[in-house]
Amino acid sequence: MQSFRRIIVALDLSEADRHILQFLAANAALMGIEKAYFVHLMPDFTLPKQVDVEFQKLFAPEYPVDEKVRDKLGFDIQEAFGEEAELEYSIEVIEGKPYEKLLHWIKVKEADLLVVGKKEVSQGSGITARRVARNAKCNILFVPVNGYSEIENIVVPLDFSNHSLHAIQAAQAFKARKPEADIHGLYVVDLPPEDYYTRSRPGKGYRGVLMESAKIAYDSFVKDNGLSREEIEMNFLENKQHDIAGHIEDFALEKPHSMIIMGARGHSPFETFLFGSISEKMVERVNVLPLLVVR
């Protein structure tokens, strides 16, 4: 069963931290998390701009900045998880080039999962979520502002590749820990240009042919990989707007307390998922739903 036992959580002392921590507190058991490294990355140990004045007043001027930051993070973590948190964790305040340090820590700690805010890891650091996604070698969870509810619905876009198999297996592992959670498979059927219907298969219902082909492919996908149909509510949508990311987002938004799990790479139309327009649109436009990218 897939789990994310060791995770690195990038925090930047902004309001986004609260949403990340509350999401993890609500869903740590669902995800199988055992150890968390809460990391704040600083180019140098000067007082971060995000730390408010009231927080600064709590400490004497000679109090080392890294200790101030560590205590602030400790307070926020305790507030989210409670004083007797079952999750084992450590707090690390690291000086150096944030982007390189983050990738280094992922490797050193053998992290199964990196958790970041939806758009940026650290305000002003130059580490965008997209940049980390391109280079981090582990699974990545993007948590948006207000995306911290307890997960009830898991939306898994599929293209029937091995990469989407990893995504559905992650969803099944979540469901095994929380049986009441629902898995919604989603395949967006790409349609040819409108004039294609006038010059190919006239009167044959080409949309129906494409939809039927997609369902046959799904049947083979389920059979070949020994998946349980009972656990997956499969959905097929036509890409009428020629916007796969938009269809995925709209579908997921219809499900209360939902998250999206996607494979890191797949075949058409997802063949450049992390490195092409679909992933970038997902990261940039989905502002209220957690997005988990599995490798």
Where are the regions a protein language model picked out?
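Structural beta-alpha unit
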Residues: 1-2, 26, 43, 60, ...
